[in-house]
């Protein structure tokens, strides 16, 4: 999970202005607070620099939309600074919390910003009063290096995305990205650049931050609104995604979809579809968002993998479930995922298919099967 690298430098400005000069500038009847404000405004422009209003390119981005007007201005200034590879920028706030919130929202909306790793900021003050803040990105690549690396990223991303049909639905696009990243990229805590997308597209090894950033980046290329969500999962720092499909919100956790990550399966890497277009209640027991804004309720099942594929069952009806297993088997599927609505039914289905080996009745001709479980989501995966 990506950390915000902040170094806070305070620069105190000691100002000596004679009473006579103040009288000339402001007149003897001007309230002292107005005089002080005028002085601070002049200092801000002289020392910090005049803040520049930046045209927004992010009005369609989810995290941006959660901000107030002042926060959006700071967001725009941060993004412009990073995209233009500037050394620093004076921001339109004197509140350090606004600066941090705007930064976190930029990182949520733009998973592709691999060329910097955080920021420093200067606080300028006139005695105890803050008169300005200056944002300074911490770049890890030069502008030329960034351009060369971006070309490598684009080459791989374009190759992958070329396989997506032009008429693909939102669901099909998310399924493709989810499967492609899990198949193409290994989970490796020792991987280089694992806090950005370079580890995915160039190194092919990453951790949760790389998976989440790459998922957001690829989905955006396909026209799917998505953000990177940071928080905790299973008691550890983690990153995953929030997506909008056909007007409904869902969660995607590509990292947890990799069976090697959770240790569900130690053989050939498989895909756990429980984290593809999941609901809030699916992740509530394990995932906790730490985003600086409230997350939407993800309640729809329309584009959930199991509903879409007809693999979700409300009851342990073995005639219905067995028929579905046979259908999948005859279609040549090597991996059959079944999801039950509750744990009791899940255990009953597992008893029939696995413990009593009834799976062989539905997969006539199969000589051996293996399986792995995700009991928290009531998912049984059969490998043929």
Language-model-derived ranges and their functions:
Residues 17-27:
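Bacterial N-terminal signal peptides
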Residues 144, 192-201, 206, 210-217:
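Conserved active-site-adjacent core of cysteine acyl-enzyme catalytic domains
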Residues 145-200:
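Secondary-structure boundary elements
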Residues 12-14:
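N-terminal export and membrane-targeting signals
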Residues 4-5, 9, 27-168, 279-384:
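N-terminal accessory/pre-domain segments preceding catalytic cores
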Residues 210-279:
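Hydrophobic/aromatic-rich core segments of domains that either
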Residues 183-188, 206-208, 232-236, 256-260, ...:
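Solvent-exposed loop/turn segments at secondary-structure junctions
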């Amino acid at each position: 999970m990506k950390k915000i690298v902040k170094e806070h430098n305070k620069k105190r400005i000691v100002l000596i202005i004679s009473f006579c000069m103040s009288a000339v500038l402001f007149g003897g009847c001007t309230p002292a607070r107005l005089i002080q404000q005028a002085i601070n405004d002049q200092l801000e422009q002289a020392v910090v620099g005049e803040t520049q209003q930046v045209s927004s390119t992010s009005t369609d981005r989810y995290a941006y939309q959660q901000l107030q007007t002042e926060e959006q201005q700071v967001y725009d200034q941060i993004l412009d600074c990073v995209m233009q590879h500037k050394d620093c920028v004076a921001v339109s706030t004197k509140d350090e919390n606004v600066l941090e919130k705007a930064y976190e929202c930029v990182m949520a909306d733009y998973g592709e910003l691999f060329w910097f790793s955080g920021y420093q900021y200067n606080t300028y003050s006139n005695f105890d009063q803050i008169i300005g803040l200056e944002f300074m990105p911490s770049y890890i690549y030069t502008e030329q290096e960034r351009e060369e690396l971006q070309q490598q990223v684009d080459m791989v991303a374009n190759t992958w995305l070329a396989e997506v049909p032009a008429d693909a639905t939102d669901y099909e696009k998310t399924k493709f990205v989810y499967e492609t990243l899990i198949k193409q990229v290994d989970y490796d805590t020792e991987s280089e650049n694992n806090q950005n997308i370079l580890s995915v597209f160039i190194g092919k090894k990453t951790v949760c931050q790389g998976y989440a950033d790459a998922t957001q980046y690829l989905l955006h290329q396909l026209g799917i609104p998505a953000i990177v969500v940071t928080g905790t999962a299973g008691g550890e720092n983690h990153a995953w995604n929030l997506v909008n499909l056909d007007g409904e919100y869902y969660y995607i956790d590509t990292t947890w979809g990799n069976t090697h990550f959770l240790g569900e399966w130690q053989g050939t890497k498989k895909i756990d579809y429980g984290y593809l277009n999941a609901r809030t209640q699916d992740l509530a027991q394990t995932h906790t968002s730490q985003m600086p804004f409230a997350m939407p309720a993800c309640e729809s099942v329309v584009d959930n993998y199991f509903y879409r594929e007809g693999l979700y069952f409300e009851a342990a009806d073995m005639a219905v479930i067995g028929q579905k297993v046979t259908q999948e088997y005859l279609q040549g599927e090597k991996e059959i995922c079944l999801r039950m609505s509750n744990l009791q039914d899940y255990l009953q289905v597992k008893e029939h298919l696995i413990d009593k080996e009834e799976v062989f009745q539905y997969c006539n001709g199969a000589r051996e099967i293996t399986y792995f479980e995700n009991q928290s989501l009531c998912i049984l995966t059969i490998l043929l």
